[in-house]
C-alpha cells in the first residue's frame, strides 16, 4: 500500500514537472527499493544511450545518484550496476563519459554506511572496484562487449518468423544485433519500435516483407532465403522489367528536361547529352533483355528513344537558331513576345538622357585668403570694401568659401591698403604698414572716445619715424623716437589727452578740468634768473596763448611730470649738466642713474605703461587722480607729499619734506635724497 502511494506521488510529480520518459526510467532503475533494476529497464536504457538526446539525460541522472548521501546507498549501488551494464551493452560514448568521472567512482571505494548493524557500504565498495577495473582495461571492455553480442544472438532465432522483423516482448529483439560489432547496436538503439515503423511497413511498399527477410537472412549468413521459390520471385521483382522500365522512363524524363534547359540557354552540348541518353536507353533495354523480356519491347524502347532523340534534335534546331554559326542566343522573356534587347546605341542614348551626378573632380576656384581678427572693433572693423576680384568666381560660391560674392558686402579683410585710416588694434602685427598718422579727433577730450590709431600696436619695436608725441605714437618700450619731442610738454595737454600736440590751434578751455584753473610749478627756473621769484607764480606765454608753466627739460628726451627726462636707449650724461635746480645735480643722481624714474618702475615701466598710467587710462581718471592712482602713486604720491599740498617749493622744506617720493618709488634712495638737502636748500632758496 505504501509502495503504491509512493508510485502515485512520483507519477504526479513527473506530470507536473514534465519529466522526460527516459529520465523516469533511469530513476526507476536506480530507486531506493529493495530490489535491483530489471533486465528490461536496463535494456531500454542501453538502447536509449545511442540517442544523442537521451544520452545526456541518462548520464546526468546516474552521476546525481552516485553523489547521494549514505542513507541512499541503494541509489549508489544501483547506479554502479547500471554503469557496468551500459559499458558492456550501451553506447561507446558511455565509456568515455565514465572515464571522465573516474574520480567520482574512486571515492566510492571508501564508501561506508551501516544500516541495522550491517555494513551495507561493503557492496558499494566492491562494485566500485569492479567498475574501475573494467574502465581501465580496454581489451577487457572489447571482450565483454563481444560476449554480450554473442549472448544476444542466441535469442534472435526464437520466433523470428512469427514476429516478422519486430522487436517485441521482453526478448532482446530481432536480427539487428547479428551484424557488425559496435555498429549494429547503434542501429538497434535508434531502431526498436522506430525501426519497425521505418523498415516494416514503409520498406514493404518497395520490396515487401520478403526484402527484409532476405536482408536479415544475408546478415545471419543463411542462404535459405535465396533457395525458396518465393524469394526467387521476389529477387526477380528487384530486377524485373517493370522496375527497370520505370527507371528508364525516369531517366528519359530527366534527360529531356535537361535537354530542354540546354536548348533554352543555347548550349552546344546537346548532342552529347542525346548520345548519352541513347547509351542509357540501350543499357536499360539490355537489362530488360537479360531479364527475359521480349525483344519487341526492347525494340520499341529503342524506337521510342530514337524518337525522343529526334525530338531533342528538332528542339535544338528550333530553340537554337544560332547553333550552326557557333553563337549563343540569350533566353527569351517569360511572355515570349517581349521587345528585343536594347542595342548599345539605345543604351548609350538612355545613359545620356539620365541626369548625371555632380562632378566634384573639377578644381574649385582659389579662394582669397581671409584673416579673421576677433579682437577688432565691431563698429569700425567691418569695412565696406569694393573688391572687383570677386567677379572672377562667376557668381558661384565655391565649396567651403566664406567670402561673399557681392562686392558691397562687409568683409573681414583687414589687410586692405586702399583706405586712408585702418582701425586696427592687432596685438600680433609687429610691422607698421602706414607710418603716416591722421589726427582727426583733435578736439576730443575723452581718451576712451578716441579711435585707436593704426600704429598703436602692442609689441611693435620697429618704429623708425620721428614722432613728437611719445605717448600717442611710441609703443611699449619704444624709445627710439624720443629725440624729436623737444617741443612737447605733457602738462600743456589736458588730463589724459596726449593726442593734441602743438598744432597751432588754440585749445578750448575745459572748466571741469581742475588743472586748468591753476598753474603747475616750473622747475626750469630753479637756480636761474630771479631767485626770489616763485616757480608757481612764474608765468610763461606759450605759442598758443595759454598760460602754462614750463617744466625743466633737457635737450634730449621727453619731459616727465617730475621735471626729469626719460632717458633714451643711449644714456644721457645728466650728472654733468651742472647745478640746475638741485634735481639734476650729482647728489640727486639717484633719480636718473639710481633707477628712480627709469629702473625702479617709475614713469615708464611702473607708472605710465604697465600700471595703466598715462596711455591706458592713468591720467584720464579725474585729472591728476590718474597720477596718484596708476602713475605716480607708486612714487609715494607727488600730490600728497610735497608739490601740491606744500604749495610748490617756496617753503624751505619743500624738497626735504617729499618723504613720499623718497619712501615710495625711491625707497633705497632715502640717503641720497636726505644727503642732498643742504644742496637743495642752498641752491633752491628763493
From Swiss-Prot:
Molecular-function GO terms, alphabetical: clathrin binding; phosphatidylinositol-4,5-bisphosphate binding; phospholipid binding
**Has keyword Membrane?**
yes
Q: What's any GO biological process attached to this entry?
A: actin filament organization
> Record's Gene Ontology CC terms?
AP-2 adaptor complex; clathrin vesicle coat; clathrin-coated pit; clathrin-coated vesicle; contractile vacuole; endosome; plasma membrane
Compositional bias (Polar residues) spans? Answer: 185-211, 237-256, 491-503, 558-567
ENTH domain: residues covered: 14-145
This protein's source sits in the domain of life called Eukaryota
Chief subcellular location: membrane
Q: Where is the composition biased (Basic and acidic residues)?
A: 212-225, 504-521
The free-text function statement in the UniProt record for this protein reads: Binds to membranes enriched in phosphatidylinositol 4,5-bisphosphate (PtdIns(4,5)P2).
Classification via PANTHER family: CLATHRIN INTERACTOR 1, EPSIN/ENT-RELATED
Quote the protein name from its UniProt record: Epsin
Amino acid at each position: 500500500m505504501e509502495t503504491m502511494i509512493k508510485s502515485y506521488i512520483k507519477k504526479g510529480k513527473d506530470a507536473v514537472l514534465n519529466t522526460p520518459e527516459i529520465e523516469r526510467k533511469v530513476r526507476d532503475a536506480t530507486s531506493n527499493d529493495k530490489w535491483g533494476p530489471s533486465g528490461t529497464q536496463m535494456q531500454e536504457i542501453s538502447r536509449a544511450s545511442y540517442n544523442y538526446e537521451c544520452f545526456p539525460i541518462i548520464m546526468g541522472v546516474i552521476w546525481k545518484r552516485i553523489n547521494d548521501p549514505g542513507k541512499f546507498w541503494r541509489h549508489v549501488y544501483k547506479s554502479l550496476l547500471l554503469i557496468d551494464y551500459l559499458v558492456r551493452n550501451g553506447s561507446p560514448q558511455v565509456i568515455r563519459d565514465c572515464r571522465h568521472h573516474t574520480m567520482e567512482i574512486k571515492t566510492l571505494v571508501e564508501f561506508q554506511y551501516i544500516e541495522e548493524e550491517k555494513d551495507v557500504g561493503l557492496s558499494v565498495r566492491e562494485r566500485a572496484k569492479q567498475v574501475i577495473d573494467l574502465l581501465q582495461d580496454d581489451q577487457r571492455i572489447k571482450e565483454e562487449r563481444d560476449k554480450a553480442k554473442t549472448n544476444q544472438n542466441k535469442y534472435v532465432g526464437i520466433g523470428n518468423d512469427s514476429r516478422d522483423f519486430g522487436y517485441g516482448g521482453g526478448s532482446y529483439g530481432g536480427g539487428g544485433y547479428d551484424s557488425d560489432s559496435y555498429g549494429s547496436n547503434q542501429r538497434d538503439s535508434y531502431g526498436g519500435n522506430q525501426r519497425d515503423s521505418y523498415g516494416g511497413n514503409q520498406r514493404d511498399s518497395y520490396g515487401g516483407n520478403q526484402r527484409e527477410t532476405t536482408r536479415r537472412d544475408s546478415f545471419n549468413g543463411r542462404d535459405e532465403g535465396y533457395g525458396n521459390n518465393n524469394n526467387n520471385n521476389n529477387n526477380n521483382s528487384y530486377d524485373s522489367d517493370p522496375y527497370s522500365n520505370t527507371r528508364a522512363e525516369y531517366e528519359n524524363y530527366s534527360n529531356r528536361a535537361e535537354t530542354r534547359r540546354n536548348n533554352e540557354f543555347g548550349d552546344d552540348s546537346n548532342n552529347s547529352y542525346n548520345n548519352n541518353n541513347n547509351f542509357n536507353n540501350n543499357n536499360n533495354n539490355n537489362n530488360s533483355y537479360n531479364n527475359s523480356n521480349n525483344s519487341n519491347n526492347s525494340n520499341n524502347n529503342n524506337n521510342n528513344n530514337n524518337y525522343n532523340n529526334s525530338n531533342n534534335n528538332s528542339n535544338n534546331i528550333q530553340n537554337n537558331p544560332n547553333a550552326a554559326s557557333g553563337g549563343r542566343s540569350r533566353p527569351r522573356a517569360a511572355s515570349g513576345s517581349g521587345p528585343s534587347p536594347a542595342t548599345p546605341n539605345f543604351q548609350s542614348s538612355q545613359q545620356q538622357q539620365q541626369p548625371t551626378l555632380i562632378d566634384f573632380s573639377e578644381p574649385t576656384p582659389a579662394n582669397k585668403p581671409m584673416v579673421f581678427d576677433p579682437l577688432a572693433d565691431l563698429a569700425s572693423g567691418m569695412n565696406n570694401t569694393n573688391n572687383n576680384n570677386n567677379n572672377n568666381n562667376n557668381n558661384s560660391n565655391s565649396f567651403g568659401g566664406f567670402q561673399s560674392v557681392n562686392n558691397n558686402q562687409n568683409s573681414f579683410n583687414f589687410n586692405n591698403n586702399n583706405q586712408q585710416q585702418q582701425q586696427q588694434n592687432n596685438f600680433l602685427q609687429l610691422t607698421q604698414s602706414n607710418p603716416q598718422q591722421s589726427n582727426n579727433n583733435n578736439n576730443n577730450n575723452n581718451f576712451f572716445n578716441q579711435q585707436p590709431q593704426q600704429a598703436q600696436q602692442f609689441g611693435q619695436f620697429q618704429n623708425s619715424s620721428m614722432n613728437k608725441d611719445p605717448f600717442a605714437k611710441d609703443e611699449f618700450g619704444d624709445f627710439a623716437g624720443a629725440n624729436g619731442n623737444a617741443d612737447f610738454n605733457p602738462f600743456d595737454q589736458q588730463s589724459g589727452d596726449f593726442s593734441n600736440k602743438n598744432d597751432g590751434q588754440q585749445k578750448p578751455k575745459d572748466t571741469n578740468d581742475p588743472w586748468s584753473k591753476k598753474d603747475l610749478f616750473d622747475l626750469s627756473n630753479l637756480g636761474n634768473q630771479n631767485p626770489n621769484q616763485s616757480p608757481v607764480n612764474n608765468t610763461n606765454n606759450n605759442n598758443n596763448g595759454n598760460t602754462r608753466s614750463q617744466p625743466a627739460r633737457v635737450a634730449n628726451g621727453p619731459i616727465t611730470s617730475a621735471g626729469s627726462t626719460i632717458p633714451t636707449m643711449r644714456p644721457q650724461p645728466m650728472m654733468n649738466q651742472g647745478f640746475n635746480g638741485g634735481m639734476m645735480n650729482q647728489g640727486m643722481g639717484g633719480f636718473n642713474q639710481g633707477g628712480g624714474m627709469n629702473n625702479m618702475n617709475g614713469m615708464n615701466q611702473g607708472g605710465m605703461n604697465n600700471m595703466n598710467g598715462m596711455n591706458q587710462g592713468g591720467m584720464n581718471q579725474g585729472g591728476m587722480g590718474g597720477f596718484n592712482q596708476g602713475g605716480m602713486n607708486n612714487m609715494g604720491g607727488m600730490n600728497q607729499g610735497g608739490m601740491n599740498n606744500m604749495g610748490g617749493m617756496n617753503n624751505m622744506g619743500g624738497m626735504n619734506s617729499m618723504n613720499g617720493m623718497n619712501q615710495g618709488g625711491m625707497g633705497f634712495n632715502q640717503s641720497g635724497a636726505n644727503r642732498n638737502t643742504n644742496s637743495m636748500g642752498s641752491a633752491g632758496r628763493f
